[in-house]
Amino acid sequence: MAGSHPYFNLPDSTHPSPPSTPPSLHWHQRCQPSDATNGLLVALLGGGLPAGFVGPLSRMAYQASNLPSLELVICRCLFHLPIALLLKLRGDPLLGPPDIRGRTCFCALLNVLNIGCAYSAVQVVPTGNAATVRKHSSTVCSAILTLCLESQVLSGYDWCGLLGSILGLIIIVGPGLWTLQEGTTGVYTGLGYVQAFLGGLALSLGLLVYRSLHFPSCLPTVAFLSGLVGLLGSVPGLFVLQSPVLPSDLLSWSCVGAVGILTLVSFTCVGYAVTKAHPALVCAVLHSEVVMALILQYFMLHETVAPSDIMGAGVVLGSIAIITARNLICERTGKVEE
């Protein structure tokens, strides 16, 4: 046919062709969240919210069976050990590459110190306040350390959300610090706040060390080492510092199992998020743990939630909204395949 000959398919030079327009794209193709936004959402939904259950469940296990904090650390670490099977199946070394093995073990040690301080603090301090102090210190330390060590700056909106979250935490924990009782009870409560602060410091250092590790199986290796280091340090300490106690009822066993699963999920999500977004922003989004802990403190533990706690939780949620909205930047797919 004549119409199929290449000669007849040439464009007509006397009539200029209309300007080419890119084909219409679906909404999910035109606008997609950035990596930082994905990381923050993972930290919010998979890191902060599950972690909010850990404090109340730990307190319930302690109240039901007088389960010491070291046993909770041991039970949590046991959930990390099966990750060794995944590393073996992939053919990866259990302790990480030899050249950065020391840094990997140090990161695992910081994670163990973080969870140990957290579990010890919630036994003498209200769960919401303990989570508040820990997240407060982790956010401030992450912002300072990242700025000094990595020279990674934050935008004005990020600083606004960061400072707002810190303000909310001060509103929550401030009245409790001014009303510490004198005597032994006040000393134990003060030590609980100190442990919560040290736990946040260990968390921020652990996140920075984790960001410096670059090998394919980084996350499962650090998770396994956290369990291994935790067991090596907690099992001897349990027999020296405390008397081993077995959970006495089904409620205690359920709380221990839930703590192990939820903390492993939170650990994995935070490890992913910190490779995508600024550590200080990840810690700020993790303040959702505080809000969840306050809710569970009232409904599960039947502990009083002061008006300042509610006000501070509202400020924290508003700050998280600012940070998340700032990072919800739509990336247009400007390239059209020809």
Curated annotation (Swiss-Prot):
Residues 1-29 are annotated as: Disordered. SUPFAM superfamilies: Multidrug resistance efflux transporter EmrE. It comes from the Eukaryota. Pfam families: EamA (PF00892). Keywords: Membrane, Repeat, Transmembrane, Transmembrane helix. The chain crosses the membrane at residues 37-57, 160-180, 190-210, 221-241, 250-270, 281-301, 305-325. Belongs to the SLC35G solute transporter family. PANTHER family: ACYL-MALONYL CONDENSING ENZYME-RELATED, SOLUTE CARRIER FAMILY 35 MEMBER G5-RELATED. This is Solute carrier family 35 member G4. It comes from Homo sapiens (Human). The lineage of its organism: Eukaryota, Metazoa, Chordata, Craniata, Vertebrata. The gene is SLC35G4.
